C-alpha cells in the first residue's frame, strides 16, 4: 500500500478511535529512515516525508485539528507547529533541516503558513512512526491506541490518546465520556 494512503487511513482511524476534535493537537514523530527500511537517523528521505505529511496533514486540516511534528534528537525533539495553535508559546530559534530536525519536521516547517518551533507541548494524541518516542509531548495520561495499520512503509506505527487524570478516590464520580 502507498505510504500516503497508509498515513491517511491511520490518521482517520486514530481520530475516530481517540475522539480527537476540532482544535486538538496531534503530535507526530517520524523516522523516514525507518519508513524506507534503514536504521533510524541514517537515511532521512524528504520525498517520503512529503508523502507522510500530505497523508496526515490533509486529513487533519479538513477537521481543524492541529499537526505538531517532532524534530529528531539533534534538536532535542523540539516541535514544529502552526503559530495559531499555540499563540502564547515561547519559540526557539532554529529552522529544521534534513540532518538536524529530520525530513518530516523540515517538510512541516516549509509547508505550514506560519510555523514556529517550540521546545515542548502537551498534545491530545500522537502517532509514532519508526519508534521515535513522542511520549514527552503527550498530556497525562497516555493510553495506547491499536489501529488496523501496524506499519507505515517498513516503520513500526504506535499511536496514543490521552485522558484526564482520575482524582478524588473511592467517593468520586467520573465522566464516562472522558475515559
Where are these regions (language model features)?
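N-terminal glycine-/serine-/threonine-rich phosphate-binding loop
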Residues: 1-26, 30, 42, 46-61
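Fold-independent oxyanion-binding glycine-rich loops
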Residues: 30, 38, 70-73, 155, ...
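Generic secondary-structure signature for well-ordered alpha-helical cores
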Residues: 12, 16-19, 57-65, 109-117, ...
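Active-site histidine-anchored catalytic micro-motif
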Residues: 35-40, 44-51, 58-77, 100-101
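Ligand-binding beta-strand-loop-alpha-helix segment within the catalytic cores
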Residues: 63-125, 130
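Short acidic, glycine/serine/threonine-rich loops at helix termini
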Residues: 38-40, 79-82, 169-171
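Solvent-exposed alpha-helices and their adjacent loops that cap or buttress functional pockets
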Residues: 18-20, 100, 146-151
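Glycine-rich, aromatic-bearing surface loops/beta-hairpins
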Residues: 106, 110-179
Amino acid at each position: 500500500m502507498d505510504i500516503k494512503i497508509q498515513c491517511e487511513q491511520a490518521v482517520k482511524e486514530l481520530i475516530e478511535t481517540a475522539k480527537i476534535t476540532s482544535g486538538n493537537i496531534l503530535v507526530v514523530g517520524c523516522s523516514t529512515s525507518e519508513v524506507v527500511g534503514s536504521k533510524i537517523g541514517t537515511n532521512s528521505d524528504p520525498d517520503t516525508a512529503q508523502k507522510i505529511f500530505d497523508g496526515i496533514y490533509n486529513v487533519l486540516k479538513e477537521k481543524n485539528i492541529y499537526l505538531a511534528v517532532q524534530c529528531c534528537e539533534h534538536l532535542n525533539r523540539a516541535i514544529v507547529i502552526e503559530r495559531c495553535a499555540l499563540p502564547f508559546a515561547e519559540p526557539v530559534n532554529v529552522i529544521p533541516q534534513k540532518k538536524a530536525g529530520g525530513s518530516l519536521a523540515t517538510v512541516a516547517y516549509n509547508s505550514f503558513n506560519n510555523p514556529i518551533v517550540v521546545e515542548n507541548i502537551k498534545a491530545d494524541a500522537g502517532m509514532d512512526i519508526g519508534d521515535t518516542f513522542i511520549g514527552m509531548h503527550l498530556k497525562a495520561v497516555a493510553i495506547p491506541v491499536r489501529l488496523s495499520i501496524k506499519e507505515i512503509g517498513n516503520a513500526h506505527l504506535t499511536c496514543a490518546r490521552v485522558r484526564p487524570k482520575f482524582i478524588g478516590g473511592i467517593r468520586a464520580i467520573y465522566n464516562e465520556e472522558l475515559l
